[in-house]
Amino acid sequence: MVELTAFQYTLLQAANELVEPSGQDIRRHVDAGPFHASPMNHGRLYPNLETIVEAGLVEKGEKNDRTNLYTITDDGKDALETRAAYLSN
């Protein structure tokens, strides 16, 4: 399993909480959350989303020519459960 940053786990959690979100849906969800101090920019969002896609934790699909959708995989859900168990100890 790839080691994720706290920010990447935040993106993974957002993908889990939303239904077929676009990258911008994920950005808005994270920006609205209590743990994000400043608005996220494109240069931070998409490379980190790509990392969790490449790790097999999220699948990237197309909504249209300009918009991708991100769907959490079973491995992504397992990673969130493992992280939650680790943080609760």
Question: PLM features: residue spans?
Answer:
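Key DNA-contact positions within bacterial/archaeal DNA-binding proteins
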Residues: G43
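Short linear capping/connector segments at secondary-structure termini
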Residues: H29, K63-R66
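N-terminal helix-turn-helix DNA-binding core of bacterial DNA-binding proteins
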Residues: V2-M40
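Short, hydrophobic-biased segments on the C-terminal half of alpha helices
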Residues: Y46-E50
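Amphipathic alpha-helical dimerization/coiled-coil segments
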Residues: E81-N89
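Beta-hairpin "wing" of winged helix-turn-helix
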Residues: V53-N64, T71
